[in-house]
Amino acid sequence: GKFESQLQEIVIRGHRIELHLHPHWLDVRKENNEWVFQSYKHYKLNSLTEEKIIELFQEGVELLNHIARKAVPDYAVCAFRAGGWCVEPFEKLRSAFQICGIKVDSSVVPGMRLDGEVHALDYSGLKSNAFYRFSDDVRIPDKNGKTIELPVNGYYMSRWEKIAFALGRKMNRKNAEIFGDGKGISVIAAVSVRKRFMSFLQKGKYFNQFMLDGYINSVLIERKVSQSELPFVSIVAHPKTLTLSSLRAVEYLAAKGHHFRSLTEILEKYEI
């Protein structure tokens, strides 16, 4: 079908397709031609048994390999990203990684902390790093670890950058309209307008992932990439929330001399 053809075209062009799981889809049902989630109790992979996790990994890897190998016969999935960045505790996923030949994880966002109703995570103690190895805990680097972590790093915005960003989004609403009709789950508990305003006044800086979702200020993200001391940064993007400003940001980064590399190129260049 069309979807398989798109994936095959991706690998033919030298890019990678890897495993990404959102297990709350196990609890979905269809009503009036729409998907309805009965609950989000399985949003985190670790809400499932180890046996179920292994089963999902095997099914996903086998499906992706089956599709990709029609275009590239020796293709093999080697990386994983957990839905909602929820990869901890890793002990429960380790067997699935080993059985399925997963050597790379990219679920960690150094500096991020979320306390939501659906899930919570805490990577606030991790320093920015382009890559590292780990063994039993993705938050503890181990040079002898068998699994590679390629974090999605972030940057901090000052209060004034935050204000300028908000104004830019308001003035460029057409560029901020998403192409798709999908929505991401809200992981932040609802708070009052007053509480948000007070939080804004008290904070001196705001953490943001390097990402291309929603409205993107090209000048801001290029400046933050240039200021990074890392040898490379990973930028995340969800097709369902891409906008015209997302595409313009990619063009702007390229025009400024930044190069986009595939996972294969990164692993080979840095001999990871």
PLM feature segments, named:
Residues 1, 26-27, 89, 113-114, ...:
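Flexible loop/turn segments at secondary-structure boundaries
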Residues 1-86, 145-149, 154-161, 232:
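Metal-dependent polysaccharide deacetylase catalytic core of the NodB/CE4 family, i.e.
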Residues 3-8, 57-65, 94, 219-223, ...:
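Generic structural signal for well-ordered alpha-helices
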Residues 12-14, 100, 229, 256:
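Structured helix-beta-strand junction loops
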Residues 16, 103, 259:
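Residue-level detector of anion-binding/catalytic polar loops
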Residues 79-226:
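Active-site-adjacent pocket scaffolds in enzyme catalytic domains
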Residues 106-113, 259-272:
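A generic structural motif
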Residues 225-246, 263:
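Substrate-binding cleft of secreted/luminal carbohydrate-active enzymes
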